[in-house]
């Protein structure tokens, strides 16, 4: 089951890598287009990062299953994964699903930014929004059986708690880097807003 996630995660990571740099930022972008581009880059980067973690987590889980050791008998493969490889299984599920949703959202955002025909742009964008919502609905319906969580938000919270429980310098350093990334993201939003306001003020004066 881990390998069934690892393969599509690897394929999606390859696509997301190209998508991250698919909408370069330019100086002449207005506030709306500039913000859409920045959100698109962020969503594509989140998709790539999440799929990379899913690949590593599933690979580690597969390698652990190959270790010669005695294990209790489980009624199903899912119970085996939840019992013996809880961290790897939760990490694989959450990052794969989160990356998939981020990728669908990024495509929807890109459609309204680069397609010149307004009606077609809205049609394509809404198509991918519908796909993202449908995928989220499918996940919420079956995720309790797979992980014991009610929805993907609960799955993410469980994943975060497991990361804290794992401990270790590298895990804490990773969390610190995520906090720093959020800080700089806030600075990007603030800078874009102030620059655009200044440009509008100059144009109107």
Where are these regions (language model features)?
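Cytosol/matrix-facing amphipathic helices and coiled-coil assembly/linker segments
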Residues: 1-29, 44, 49-68
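Alpha-helical transmembrane segments of integral membrane proteins
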Residues: 34-204
